[in-house]
Amino acid sequence: MSTVVVKGNVNGGVQQPRRRRRQSLRRRANRVQPVVMVTAPGQPRRRRRRRGGNRRSRRTGVPRGRGSSETFVFTKDNLVGNSQGSFTFGPSLSDCPAFKDGILKAYHEYKITSILLQFVSEASSTSSGSIAYELDPHCKVSSLQSYVNKFQITKGGAKTYQARMINGVEWHDSSEDQCRILWKGNGKSSDPAGSFRVTIRVALQNPK
């Protein structure tokens, strides 16, 4: 009976040498292809905008709740050639209830920064006469003292007063008047004259 010697080169039941196993692992690793990421041209990356920590710093103007600025318009109608009267700007301005009984009562202080006085003529071409007007910046005069400034009854006109002319630079307590405009006509009582249209700009602060 002859004996056959089998060397370790057969796969069945016999382990391969370590050198061959290393070579096979290297071959498998070489077969793996790297993945390449392709970015489409012409598409720039988006950059995130950094927002400031305090957005309120961008706001300008008067903060809410501290002050306000309003414009009021009122009229004085049915004037005749010899009409006379006055506008006292402040809590005594009965011709403008929205200002006197409205917003003025909601603040401790105010100042009227401009006044536009307009006379709208409704007189006929045959009427004669004029309406004189005068500014009293400190409410010291109760009747017209000057006849220098006038509106012709048949033509009308307008006059603008800025803050420095009407005592409107400093703040006033809401319980006191700021200034006054007086007016008086020298025409006939039977002649229709027209109407006044008054526009005021008011600044207010320190709400109640």
Swiss-Prot record:
**Example of a GO cellular component annotation carried by this entry:** T=3 icosahedral viral capsid
Spell out the molecular function terms from Gene Ontology. structural molecule activity
Q: Where is this region: Disordered?
A: 1-69
What keywords tag this UniProt record? Capsid protein, T=3 icosahedral capsid protein, Virion
Any S-S bridges, and between which cysteines? Answer: none
Q: Where is the composition biased (Low complexity)?
A: 1-16
Where in the cell does this protein reside? Answer: Virion
By its UniProt entry, which InterPro entries does this protein fall under? Luteo_coat (IPR001517), Viral_coat (IPR029053)
Biased region (Basic residues) positions are 17-30, 44-61
Give the domain note. Answer: The N-terminus like those of many plant virus capsid proteins is highly basic. These regions may be involved in protein-RNA interaction.
Q: Which family does it belong to?
A: Belongs to the luteoviruses capsid protein family.
Function, as annotated:
Major capsid protein that self-assembles to form an icosahedral capsid with a T=3 symmetry, about 23 nm in diameter, and consisting of 180 capsid proteins monomers. Most of the 180 monomers are the major capsid protein, but a small percentage contain the minor capsid protein, which has a long C-terminal extension.
Report what the protein is called. Answer: Major capsid protein
